[in-house]
């Protein structure tokens, strides 16, 4: 953008002023455009643009004061990459109009309190950094900023508060220090010393049980640090302090106006008042820093040094990359362009490596990735398109680094890598140097590397044809080739009676007979049978139906809908029929995992089966053989999540009905005494109906929550039993030596990781019931490492 174009908007505002009074909204839009663009790259320097913008805005301060303050507050919240641009602007305006600076500070404090009450923690943190940086631009005194940060520290030391709340306040202080640390050290050294000591004391006393649970790789299995986020940031701040607060990333535009700003009158920043904690407040989960590359990993591709782990520059670069991604999370093309522009603005650092490290760090973040998987997948593709000479090599290095550590990787992170890499390969005709990974073929079936490669191949099969995938693989990989995804029709041809019954059902399907006919055909003729329908013939009925509908997904859906009444009537009669239905579904579509997953989900949506039947089936001993496969845990988590969503809907209905009835009662209390409720019978009846609905929903919620608790307890007990069984098997599946302790075998470590995966996948629900689970699920014989895993999980919300 040219310098002339930047200030065309200002000229337009001036022309409208001369022509007559413009619409206020038009002027506000122009002001927003002018202020919002001041930090952009233009033909002139940012300092020059700030100087001109200050002169322009000063003329309008009295007329549009509120609008200008609102716009600056918005920039402070949503443009954190331009903090110093806008703090300099406020400083220059404050030097010309002291009251304006005070009004801005008052507005920012009010906005911060509002954001915290709405639990918008990142935005509130952006304002804290902005307020602190106002000390560098001559708006606020260093003494008051020190007191402001000390009030955050005090909030973190309040008694009987969740650790995650206290962590947030300490993190806020640490994040402010790269901007204001030098100023505080020079002008408020005693406060700076107090802040440093208090943070050190807090970190020393803090519970760190959660760290191992949130690490992508098992502790001690890699040379890369997997530090707690607060510990890492504190170490970076300490290194910065020892370097006399010298960093190379923050553009301090106010230094160009030092003479003007140092003579300005300064304001005092009020102390921070932490919002009252309530039980329904949800704070950010603790984080573990993700590191993939060291300087040696980059040396083959770039002569530029990578900032070290303890360097504050690493933190600042990662923060800006993360912000660019957050801002453009709905536009992959714009996101990729801005990331490349950021890399070009910082030629002295191999930003490409930090971009991929940040993307994969987000993709693998525990307990939840911040963005949908498809966004990260498409963003990587877009980056490769825009930088085809460099970024493909960095991506290959990224994949190889992760593959080398796959054996110690959390199962849920392997799942995410499988989802991304299979999608990625589908855009390149599944071409890859597969032979580089043939070492996994000689490892245990439960080793992370073999599971990763096997599941990638299976997922690729879902994206493309079976023949195409097999053709792309080396001959050596036949051991982990997926089976042909065809329906299996397992009927013993020598059993004449069984064949005849199958033919009967086939003919009935062809004649499209109604549900009643099938129900009559399935009725048990055995007087001693306690079940109303013959369970074996029901399994045969399902098998024939699936065989006849096996051509496409649409045929399967059509069959399920056509015979929904038959299926539901039989399955409602006993849980045993639901088990039989799922067992038959598995036996027919065992080699087509995608069909298994889709049809199970469809049966749940149609309410033919319920969540408990699915969970019981998946953790039946007969299904243990599938517990090294990704599809099983996808089905499990979908079923459990479906129940949680149903509970959330009922909770929402209760909240709305409660508000509705309370408002109605309040309205009646506010009415004049001569107006009675019985004068309007319709309102009275509606009010009674709302109260009745509210009570019914409360009872329904209580039943559902009780059912959910029982379901989780039963399933976790079954899972622990399987893990216990794996621990008692002291022989590695591959070497047969019997020298490997049961709790160190790949199978045990994998199942333990899956146990952690389920806890994290349903963290919000399970944390509500964690005390109940601890009492009812764990027994004296439970493996200590499983109890340790659960204790780590509980510490997420300490």
Curated annotation (Swiss-Prot):
This protein's record includes keyword Nucleus: yes
Domain (MIF4G) ranges: 28-241
SMART domains registered for this protein in UniProt: MIF4G
Location relative to the cell: Nucleus
SUPFAM superfamilies cross-referenced by the UniProt entry: ARM repeat
Listed GO MF terms: mRNA binding; RNA cap binding
Composition skew (Acidic residues), residue ranges: 668-682
Pfam families, per database record: MIF4G, MIF4G_like, MIF4G_like_2
Free-text disruption phenotype from the record: Lethality in 63% of embryos.
Region annotation Disordered: where it falls in the sequence: 663-686
Keyword terms of this UniProt record: mRNA capping, mRNA processing, mRNA splicing, Nucleus, RNA-mediated gene silencing
GO cellular component annotations of the record: nuclear cap binding complex; nucleus
Keyword field contains S-adenosyl-L-methionine: no
BP terms from Gene Ontology: 7-methylguanosine mRNA capping; miRNA-mediated post-transcriptional gene silencing; mRNA 3'-end processing; mRNA export from nucleus; mRNA splicing, via spliceosome; mRNA transcription by RNA polymerase II; nuclear-transcribed mRNA catabolic process; nuclear-transcribed mRNA catabolic process, nonsense-mediated decay
Function: Component of the cap-binding complex (CBC), which binds cotranscriptionally to the 5'-cap of pre-mRNAs and is involved in various processes such as pre-mRNA splicing and RNA-mediated gene silencing (RNAi). The CBC complex is involved in miRNA-mediated RNA interference and is required for primary microRNAs (miRNAs) processing. In the CBC complex, ncbp-1 does not bind directly capped RNAs (m7GpppG-capped RNA) but is required to stabilize the movement of the N-terminal loop of ncbp-2 and lock the CBC into a high affinity cap-binding state with the cap structure.
PANTHER family referenced in this protein's UniProt entry, alphabetically: CAP BINDING PROTEIN, NUCLEAR CAP-BINDING PROTEIN SUBUNIT 1
Subunit description: Component of the nuclear cap-binding complex (CBC), a heterodimer composed of ncbp-1 and ncbp-1 that interacts with m7GpppG-capped RNA.
Family, similarity comment: Belongs to the NCBP1 family.
Record's protein name: Nuclear cap-binding protein subunit 1
Organism annotation: Caenorhabditis elegans
């Amino acid at each position: 953008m040219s310098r002339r174009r930047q200030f065309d908007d200002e000229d337009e505002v001036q022309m409208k002023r001369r022509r007559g009074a413009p619409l206020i909204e038009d002027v506000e839009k122009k002001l927003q455009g002018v202020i919002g663009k001041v930090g952009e790259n233009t033909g002139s320097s940012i300092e020059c643009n700030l100087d001109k913008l200050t002169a322009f805005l000063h003329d309008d301060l009295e007329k549009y004061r509120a609008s200008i303050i609102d716009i600056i507050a918005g920039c402070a919240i949503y443009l954190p990459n331009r903090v110093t641009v806008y703090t300099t602007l406020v400083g220059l305006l404050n030097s010309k109009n002291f009251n304006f600076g005070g009004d801005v500070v008052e507005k920012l404090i009010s906005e911060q309190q509002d954001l915290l009450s709405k639990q918008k923690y990142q935005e509130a943190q952006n304002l804290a950094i902005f307020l602190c940086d106002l000390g560098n631009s001559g708006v606020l005194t260093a003494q008051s900023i020190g007191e402001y940060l000390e009030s955050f520290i005090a909030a973190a030391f309040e008694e009987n508060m969740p650790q995650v709340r206290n962590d947030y306040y300490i993190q806020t202080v640490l994040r402010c220090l790269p901007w204001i640390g030098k100023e505080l050290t020079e002008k408020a050294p005693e406060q700076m010393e107090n802040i440093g000591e208090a943070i050190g004391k807090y970190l020393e006393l803090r519970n760190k049980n959660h760290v191992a649970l949130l690490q992508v790789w098992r502790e001690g299995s890699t040379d890369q640090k997997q530090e707690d986020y607060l510990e890492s940031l504190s170490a970076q701040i300490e290194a910065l302090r020892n370097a006399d607060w010298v960093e190379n990333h923050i553009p301090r535009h106010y230094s160009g106006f030092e003479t003007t700003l140092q003579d300005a009158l300064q304001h005092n920043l009020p102390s921070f008042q932490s919002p009252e904690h309530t039980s329904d407040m949800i704070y950010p989960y603790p984080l573990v820093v993700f590191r993939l590359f060291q300087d040696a990993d980059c040396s083959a591709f770039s002569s530029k040094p990578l900032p070290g782990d303890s360097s504050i520059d690493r933190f600042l670069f990662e923060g800006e990359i993360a912000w660019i991604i957050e801002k453009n999370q709905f536009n992959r093309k714009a996101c990729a362009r801005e990331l490349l522009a950021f890399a070009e603005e910082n030629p002295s650092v191999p930003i490409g490596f930090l971009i991929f490290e940040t993307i994969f760090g987000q993709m693998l973040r525990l307990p939840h990735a911040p963005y949908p998987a498809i966004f990260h997948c498409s963003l990587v593709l877009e980056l490769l398109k825009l930088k085809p000479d460099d970024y493909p090599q960095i991506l290959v290095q990224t994949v190889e680094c992760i593959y080398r550590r796959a054996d110690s990787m959390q199962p849920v992170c392997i799942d995410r890598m499988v989802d991304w890499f299979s999608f990625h390969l589908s855009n390149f005709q599944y071409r890859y140097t597969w032979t580089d990974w043939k070492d996994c073929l000689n490892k245990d079936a439960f080793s992370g590397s073999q599971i990763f490669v096997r599941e990638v191949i299976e997922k690729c099969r879902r994206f493309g044809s079976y023949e195409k995938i097999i053709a792309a693989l080396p001959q050596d990989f036949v051991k982990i080739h997926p089976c042909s995804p065809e329906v299996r029709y397992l009927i013993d041809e020598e059993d004449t009676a069984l064949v005849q019954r199958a033919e009967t059902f086939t003919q009935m399907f062809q004649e499209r007979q109604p549900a009643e006919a099938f129900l009559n055909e399935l009725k048990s003729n055995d007087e001693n049978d306690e079940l109303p329908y013959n369970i074996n013939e029901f399994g045969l009925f399902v098998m024939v139906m699936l065989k006849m509908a096996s051509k496409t997904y649409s045929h399967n859906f059509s069959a399920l809908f056509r015979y929904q009444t038959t299926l539901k009537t039989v399955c409602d009669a006993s849980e045993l029929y639901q088990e039989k239905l799922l067992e038959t579904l598995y036996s027919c579509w065992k080699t087509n995992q995608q069909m298994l997953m889709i049809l199970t989900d469809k049966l749940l949506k149609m309410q033919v089966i319920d969540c408990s039947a699915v969970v019981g089936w998946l953790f039946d001993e007969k299904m243990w053989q599938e517990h090294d496969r990704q599809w099983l845990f996808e089905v499990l988590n979908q079923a459990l999540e479906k129940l949680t969503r149903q509970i959330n809907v009922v909770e929402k209905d209760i909240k709305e009905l409660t508000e509705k009835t309370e408002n109605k009662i309040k309205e009646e209390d506010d009415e004049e005494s001569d107006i009675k409720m019985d004068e309007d019978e319709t309102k009275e009846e509606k009010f009674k109906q709302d109260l009745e609905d509210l009570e019914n929903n409360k009872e329904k919620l209580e039943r559902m929550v009780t059912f959910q608790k029982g379901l989780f307890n039963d399933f976790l007990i079954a899972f622990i039993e399987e893990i216990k069984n794996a621990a008692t098997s002291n022989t590695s599946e591959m070497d047969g030596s019997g020298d490997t302790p049961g709790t160190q075998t790949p199978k045990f470590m994998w199942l333990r990781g899956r146990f952690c995966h389920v806890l994290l996948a349903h963290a919000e629900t399970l944390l509500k019931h964690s005390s109940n689970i601890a009492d009812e699920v764990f027994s004296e014989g439970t493996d200590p490492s499983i109890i340790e895993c659960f204790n780590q999980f509980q510490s997420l919300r300490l």
